From Swiss-Prot:
Keyword ATP-binding set for record: no
UniProtKB keywords: Cytoplasm, Membrane, Transmembrane, Transmembrane helix
Superkingdom of origin organism: Eukaryota
Protein name (database record): Putative uncharacterized membrane protein C622.03c
Length: 132
């Protein structure tokens, strides 16, 4: 078997039965969700830094050109553009967060998971502290 090749859902269901199937799916879903959450933190921090830098630029620009009436119009226009960009970024972040989570399981992972579960069960069954 090729461990690099993805496995189809019906093959996975035929290889693993009942609780074992559910455990593997839960494990892989958790890993995929954790990976997405790590990327989401970076996007969130980039978003916050963009907001702060744009607002500071507008504040400095306001103090420098306070006496010129045309400068107020420029500041208002810059503020409107920044607000539009922020709305687009928020929509992009919501889209990224709402995408369907893709879980990919490889053949080698299924075999390793079965072996690990079997080893754990054997260890538990041979334990002197086993409950009756």
């Amino acid at each position: 078997m090729n461990p690099k090749k993805s496995i189809q859902l019906w093959e996975l269901q035929s290889l693993l039965k009942g609780a074992t199937y559910k455990k593997l799916i839960e494990k892989k879903t958790y890993e995929a969700g954790k990976e997405r959450a790590d990327n989401y933190d970076f996007l969130f921090m980039s978003f916050i830094s963009f907001i702060v830098s744009c607002r500071l630029f507008i504040l400095v620009f306001t103090f420098i050109f306070k006496g010129f009436p045309s400068a107020i119009q420029v500041i208002a226009m810059i503020d409107a553009v920044v607000n539009a960009l922020l709305i687009l970024i928020v929509l992009a972040m919501l889209f990224i967060g709402s995408r369907k989570l893709t879980v990919e399981i490889r053949r080698g992972e299924v075999e390793d998971f079965q072996e690990n579960l079997k080893a754990r069960e054997d260890t538990f069954n041979s334990s002197p502290y086993q409950r009756y």
